[in-house]
Amino acid sequence: MTDKELKRSVLTVTAFASFLTPFMGSSVNLALPSIGNEFGVNAVTLNWIVSSYMLSTSVLLLPAGRVGDILGRKKIFTAGLVIFTLTMILLTFTPNIKWLIGARVIQGLGSAMLFATNLAILTSVFPPGERGRAMGINVTAVYIGLSSGPFLGGLLTRYLGWRSIFAFLVPMGIISLILIRTKMKEEWAEAKGETFDWQGAVIYGFSLAAIMFGFSKLPSAAGWAITASGLILMPLFVMREKRTKYPLFDITLISKNRVFAFSNLAALIHYAATSAIGFFLSLYLQYIKELGPRDAGFVLMCWPLTMALISPAAGKLSDRQNPGVL
């Protein structure tokens, strides 16, 4: 396989996989009222359908990326896609809300493995001068998933029921696995032979889980206590990573690399400001404004559709202009 063919194959596979998780997320947000009506649960319980997935993904994202560096990014990427697809089958036939939330936790593991290795594979294949365009295409796939999710998810929910959203994604996951098997022949393991920092991973996982779970319980006393315990563990994680030879996360990237630090800060602000919109706006449009899933989907698809249209040009332009200015 030539270098050009490898780049095309990797970009196709990663973009296809990048479409799946945001499509699922935006579709599920739209289906929440229908899920609540079927299982007879309130908005607090419905929130755990989203939060359980996000919590699992967040806690496992960093360890999954490190394991990918050691064992091979393609292996972790493939395993993540297998888990993600299998949980879609479980979610299609879920009998109750507990089963649904549990399957979403497992699905978060698969999603973490996909997210942690997706862009890492791209940066391993594409040189610096071509990465902006490649990442722009990849991000476009993400926002196509976000924008088409409300529309198609609304149609599926209205005419076939909310379970059809998960069933719809099963063949797409299988197609992605076939593409990996036939098109992605290389493997990337830049930290092969290094050890995995299990202690750091445990501290990091408990810290982040406590912070996120504690926030969900605020302003109760238990919520403050759980959040405080998570915040206390975070400095311990930093000290652990500074001492170990092969850290889970290189802390010096934040202190010495301003571009890395501020780009991640910008991403944090962006996603913190927008991640809750899909959840609350979906409930507002369908419960308060009494819109159907299809019409609510049209409203929810506007902002990600705009991003999907702009991302390719922005990525290509970042190869020529200062990304900081953009």
Where are these regions (language model features)?
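Hydrophobic transmembrane-helix bundles of small-molecule transporters
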Residues: 158-265, 270
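Transmembrane-helix bundle of Major Facilitator Superfamily
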Residues: 1-182, 302, 310-326
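Rossmann-like NAD(H)/NADP(H) cofactor-binding core
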Residues: 44, 204, 294
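12-transmembrane solute porter fold
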Residues: 9-20, 28-30, 160, 222-223, ...
